Amino acid sequence: MKRLEVLFFLVVVSLFSCKNSSDEHNNIIHKIKKSPHDFMFMQRAYPSGELKTDAYSKAVQWKKERIYRSTNANVLWEFAGPTNIGGRITDIEIPVDKAETYYVGAASGGIFKTTDGGDNWLPIFDEQEMLSIGDIEISKNNTDIIWLGTGEVNAGGGSLAYDGNGMFKSDDGGLTWESRGLPDVGSISKVLIDPVNEQTIFVGAMGPLFKKNNQRGVYRSTNDGQDWEQVLLVSDSTGIIDMSIHPNNGNIIYAASWERIRRPNNRQYGGETSRIYRSQDGGDTWEELTNGLPSDPNDKGRISIDISQSNPEVLYAFYTDKIGNVEGTFKTTDGGDSWAEVNSISNGTSYHWWFGGVFVDPTDENIVYNSGFVMEKTLDGGTTWGSTFSNVHVDQHAVAFNTQVPGEVLIGNDGGLYKSSTNGDTYQKDNTLPITQFYRFYVDPQNENKVYGGTQDNNTIRTTSAGIDDWQPIFGGDGFQPLVQSDNTNIIYALSQRGNLGKSINDGVSFNGALNGIPSSDVNNWDTAITFDPADSQTLYYGTQRIYKTTNGAGNWGVISPDLSNGPHSGNLAYGTVTSIDVSPLDSNLIYAGTDDGNVWVTQDSGTNWTLVSDTLPNLWVTKVLASSSDVSQVYVTYSGYRYGEEHGHVFKSEDYGTTWSDISNNLPDIPVNDILKDNYGNLFLGTDIGVLASADEGENWEPLGVNMPSVVVNDLHIHENSEYLYVATYGRSSYKLDISNNILSTSFTTLASAITLYPNPASDYVNLSFIEAGEDYKIEIYDALGKKVLEKNNVSSSSDGRIYLNGISAGIYYINVYSDTDQTTKKLVVN
């Protein structure tokens, strides 16, 4: 293999060891808000610029086929929080006949249902392939009928990696779901049920975010979703971002189109084909509405439209311009024939394409909410606007009115769910939804109760009690890798987007900038790499396109490498940065680095010489380089992305410092791998886009680990050495943990699994356990979908059917652990 030796003269270090004069690196702003970035898409799409959604689907099916017959099928994850931080909400719906039942759609966390006004929530979409939620619609005639359009429409590639997979319908209040087509329309913005004929359904589709095609527009089904017809296509780069239907006449439909082009290197969020359309014949024909509406292509970006339920002649439309600024709010009182601009909201950010919604109170045509950067409301039809739900988390996306409870309004934003009983004048945040989107994770090395995480748009957060509902922010912006110094845990490092590093010496009470010596002209990854030297807590490494080292706890940094990437890349592509750094715990001179454009490097002399060791490895985004803790010459590397006509895997191992590599992916599906760790028993764990996978035999065989975690992106893994717990940071379902103090992986399949049958399943009042062979007593434990034990029963006899009564157990998905003296298995139970 060709080897590239780089001698990096130490004199270069002196060029960058001087104090950086830029204040931006030394001033920490605790709420840094920038427009959403393409990070998650970029790492999965490199170098082709596309995602293989068919490969993702196959990977999910691979997992489903194995999860209950896996050698690890008896493993249950314990939910580790948080519930009180929240995450991005895309939709909220309230049935017209159930005042305390709400359905909430999360951007990447599925659907949650409550029947007690938000005290308790149940995930009801976890068995499905995609947890990205677009729009929920509930029948007014039978509120057990729910339609769902998958795929988040908010155009933030930093948080959006996968589109949806079409339409789903539930006839039992969300307990079970059936696919109803349109798997290729990308993200679905709106689902409408014809108020007269509920067999007729309309769907607004934005199409795939990162490519042009004609699978977007308005779709119609006249036979309950069995067949679909595209009834409006504006262009191959213009989708439907919002729709409304006349409450009494299903022939009258309004659709707002949005010309939207997003690529890793460019963005266009508006243009001539951003329009409002109306159909008066049930979607057969459409007319563009123009009278009084913006006409200049530069003035037409994302458009939201809503119809008054109390006076259907009144509609409101909210326009952003092509850049994302507020263009105006427009109102019609004649069903759309003519429009007039009313006063508009005041919040002025330049990325209203991230939200920009308008919602009319169903009981009063003059009360309108606008979901912008903050939430604003008018009580007089748009003449004046004022703030409502003041001081909630920014970036508003959803509003729901409870028509059975006057004054009750729910809103959803990037920080979760808020509920008001006073029309927004006062409110409470919901602290029970487990939908936080983690990027990175860390646990205090001396105190397992102090757990840290970096989150999407919800800061760097922590709990000091290992609780699930008491997490608090300590460092602003999008949070990334936190670190805690092992010999003085009052010293904490925290990162926000693009490498903004802060250091606290008072246990997180305050932070100061910690980038002295790193030029602001360097290129930072959205998720900047940073790590400790395991042997010296004062020594840290930090990656831009180069690697920097500090030996005095970030007092100052010096560069120890050349540009390790293949950059600078052409255009606006942000590739060309270090994504992973790892220092051998056996030799501090041995350092590995990986980049977002496929390079893997090693130095064995603390950075004086660097060797490129990736010539035979895939040209994909490197997510993790892991130096072995048991063999100094052993190293692992993992990759994001997909195969395109190539047979390479996503996990590789070297026994000679990277000189040669073995692909240990083997039966692993074609799926991005985001992290790898190894425990004291030699077990390997992978964080992937479909959850956690594990191998007990150095990658010869990979199996799903645990049965109660949905197919959610796992960005980070962390093993806490003292407590011997494995922590998992998910992107949309908060975090989980697992006791690995004993060897949890087995190389043989359980025999108990095939010896037990559950019936009835689904169950209501009780479930029977039927045993093939009698003669032994068993212990039974039932856990909910979040890993909370809800029932335990000992000495269940196998001599006859063991009946377990389900008193007090709500409808939902549960897992029954069955223990014998020598074996254990887990069975899935549906309670309805």
Where do the model's predicted regions map?
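Beta-propeller blade termini and top-face loops
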Residues: 21-742
